[in-house]
Amino acid sequence: MKKRLAALFLIIACLSGCSDRKAGRTMTEDVDDSEVVADTVGVEGEDPDELIADEPMSVAVDELFDDFIFNFAANRKLQMERIVFPLLVNSGEKKEYIERQAWKMERFFMHQDYYTLIVDTPEQIELLKDTALTAATVEKIFLDDHFVRQYLFHREKGRWMLTEIRNQTMPRNPNAPFLNFYEQFVSDSVFQRESLCNEIEFVGPDPDDDFKQMEGVITPDFWDAFRPDLPKGLIYNIVCGNQHPSADQKIFVLRGIANGLEVELTFRLRNGRWKLRKMTT
């Protein structure tokens, strides 16, 4: 019992770092082209893109999509080199093209200190580090507007390239049922409590040993004390491989950028309702 309580208090300490993530702007606002990426500022007044551009890009930047997308979002020069212009914007029946001179820098989640993933299995998380990967999609999900913008990347001749943007209403997205659930889960405290299993498994660091993990259980009565601060309004997803609309499990990953934070929430679909059954920190 003492070890379980110690683990629970440790989770509070780990998750409390999430509380300052809420941005001052409305989450559905696009990042302005002139916005500064905090992690890249070295000298006041200098353009962070120019600072990054001065650093030589390793050939290894294309080996893992996980590495590439961060460089793509932070380096203006690299981004312009890795877009197939004119870039197709596919909105179903309507198709348009963006010319090179009209493109605005897309920073994705770099204005935050975290990004998110939605997967069916733990194995799909590891695909970001699969050197054999040849296609990936970054999804910009506007929960309030029920709208998804997809950025399609393909690795061509060893180089990752943005080849297309697709706009779709949320119901057309393979994750639509879960996204509708998540939107209510993070905005309605009563619904959130009703969406908890009677016992929520957790896995976290052992307070007595930095090299070990320990397991325990959180009951709904303790959830308010331990729940992480989850993003609302705008979230991102990186899709590697196939999405399965009929999957009865979804893992929502909240991963810090350069701060070591990682929280995984595992939901299971039971009798037509999503329930949180596990949290890993």
Q: For each predicted feature, which ranges?
A:
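Surface-exposed, charged secondary-structure patches
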Residues: L87-G92, E96-D145, D206, K212-L261
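Short beta-strand edge/turn micro-motifs at domain boundaries
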Residues: L143-N173, G260-T281
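Coil residues (strongly favoring Ser/Thr
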Residues: S34, D39-T40, E50, E63, ...
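Sec-dependent bacterial lipoprotein signal peptides
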Residues: M1-S16
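Post-signal peptide N-terminal segment of mature Sec-exported envelope proteins
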Residues: T26-V59
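Bacterial signal peptide processing site
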Residues: C18-K22
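Short, aromatic-enriched amphipathic alpha-helices that serve as compact interaction elements
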Residues: V59-K77, N175-F191
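Surface-exposed beta-loop interaction hotspot
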Residues: K157-E194, E199-M214
